[in-house]
């Protein structure tokens, strides 16, 4: 199967936390949600993929190339959005864009202007003046303006109100359809996954519990059902029951 991203046996150790043998893959034109509670290892996984932290072992392949050996080349083909980032907070969007576009050989100004208009962004505003949702939209506009084939997003919907979050998830679906790219995004909000993902990877305490297409993922947790459950479990119920089982084990120990 063709993949745009393959993560194989990534390991990273910190005092009190270990990312252990993390593996999953993402196919073209798909959206994968990376789910887990706060502190499960989602952000560390994304940072290890991008070599923002150096994994102790494992490999990452993007576009059939070893990312760590071809990092500069691969980064020309990806877009990265980390929620909560306030880079150049006092600079106008136009100034940030002028700096950013110099790093990409295939920068498309017409594409940039299309998304600035589509997202109703005002380039004369300073970055710090944007709402959380508008900041994410601006960062998406930058990523899409160099025709990114893979978007890696860390908690992009965190802190957004329900309306803004729903709008952003709709944008993700539109992007995958119109721009022919794939998206990997982390979240602890299970409703995000219900609305827009094709695939789900669930991380618990630095380990991947399951990684599969959404239907297969849901079926793989049917053992958590009780006699009182008349229908399939929701993603929220799966996560709550899985984490509750861990709490019970900790108490028993």
State the predicted function of each range.
Residues 7-10, 17-27, 58:
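Conserved beta-strand
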Residues 35-37:
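The feature captures the beta-strand-to-loop junction immediately N-terminal to the Walker
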Residues 50:
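Helix-to-loop junction immediately C-terminal to a conserved catalytic motif
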Residues 58-69, 73-74:
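Conserved ABC transporter NBD signature motif
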Residues 82-138:
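ABC-family P-loop ATPase nucleotide-binding domains
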Residues 151-155:
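Catalytic Walker B motif of ABC-type/P-loop ATPase nucleotide-binding domains
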Residues 162-164:
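Helix N-cap at the start of a conserved alpha-helix in ABC-type nucleotide-binding domains
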């Amino acid at each position: 199967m063709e993949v745009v991203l393959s993560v194989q046996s990534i390991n990273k150790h910190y005092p009190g936390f270990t990312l252990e043998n993390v593996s999953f893959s993402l196919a073209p034109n798909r959206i994968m949600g990376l789910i887990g509670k706060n502190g499960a290892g989602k952000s560390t996984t994304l940072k290890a993929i991008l070599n923002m932290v150096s994994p102790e072992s494992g490999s990452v392949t993007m576009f059939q190339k070893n990312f760590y050996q071809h990092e500069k080349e691969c980064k020309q083909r990806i877009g990265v959005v980390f929620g909560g980032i306030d880079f150049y907070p006092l600079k106008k969007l136009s100034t940030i864009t002028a700096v950013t576009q110099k790093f990409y050989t295939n920068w498309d100004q017409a594409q940039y202007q299309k998304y600035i208009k589509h997202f109703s962004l005002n380039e004369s505003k300073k970055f710090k003046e944007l709402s959380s949702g508008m900041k994410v939209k601006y960062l998406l506009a930058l990523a899409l303006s160099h025709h990114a084939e893979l978007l890696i997003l860390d908690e992009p919907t965190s802190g957004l109100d329900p309306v803004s979050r729903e709008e952003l998830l709709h944008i993700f679906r539109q992007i995958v359809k119109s721009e022919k790219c794939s998206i990997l995004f982390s979240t602890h909000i299970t409703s995000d996954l219900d609305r827009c993902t094709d695939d789900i990877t669930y991380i618990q305490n630095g380990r991947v519990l399951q990684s599969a297409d959404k239907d297969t993922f849901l079926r793989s947790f049917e053992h958590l059902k009780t006699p009182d459950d008349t229908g399939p479990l929701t993603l929220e119920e799966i996560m709550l029951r899985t984490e509750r089982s861990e709490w019970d084990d900790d108490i028993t120990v």
